[in-house]
Amino acid sequence: MQEEKVNLSRRNFLYIAASGLGGIAAGATAVPFIGSMLPAADTLAASKTEFDVSTVAPGQLVVIQWQGKPVFVVHRTADMLKRVKGHDDLLKDPNSEAIDAVQAEWMKTPEQRIYRSIKPDYLILVASCTHLGCIPLFKPSAGRKEWGDSVPEDWPGGWHCPCHGSYYDLSGRVVNGSPAPHNLHVMPYKYISDTTVLIG
């Protein structure tokens, strides 16, 4: 039997060519597959909401939509801002420091944690009670006039959840004794002009 001489350079070329074509085929298959897992353009557009806060009158609350959820936007008056402070003993998490709570990344300074907003005048919160997701009612008046005997006489005003009786102050901080475990959530947002916020 005669041994045939193997052409190693040709074998290496065929091996490299086949491997290269296999890699190209795998990449061509993977790109559309991975692309199909990315959100569609309309989904990305819905994940962010722009809103002009200057359209909210002082003392007024408006409800807008973000990712299918209602969002409170409140233009707090000077009187409302005064009533945000001075009742920490009534609150579960007065400085918004709970580790497992949903808070925006920008909430770093003590003032931002108390007012829970980038600009103290404008408060932007997810309009969903942190107990079971009901929408709390906005009752900005101080004292028991709108609240009844279930709150202290010097109550500063805020929100009341009619489903199970949770209370929140004018910064959306939950009151001791409420079934809600956390303050109302502050979603990520930023100002893209002096009066326009981009939520999401």
Predicted regions located by residue number:
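Pocket-edge structural micro-motifs
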Residues: V53, W66, V74-H75, V126, ...
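C-terminal segment of N-terminal export signals and the immediately downstream linker at the start
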Residues: A26-K69
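Rieske [2Fe-2S] iron-sulfur-binding domain
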Residues: K92-G200
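Extracytoplasmic/periplasmic/luminal assembly and interaction segments
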Residues: V63-P110
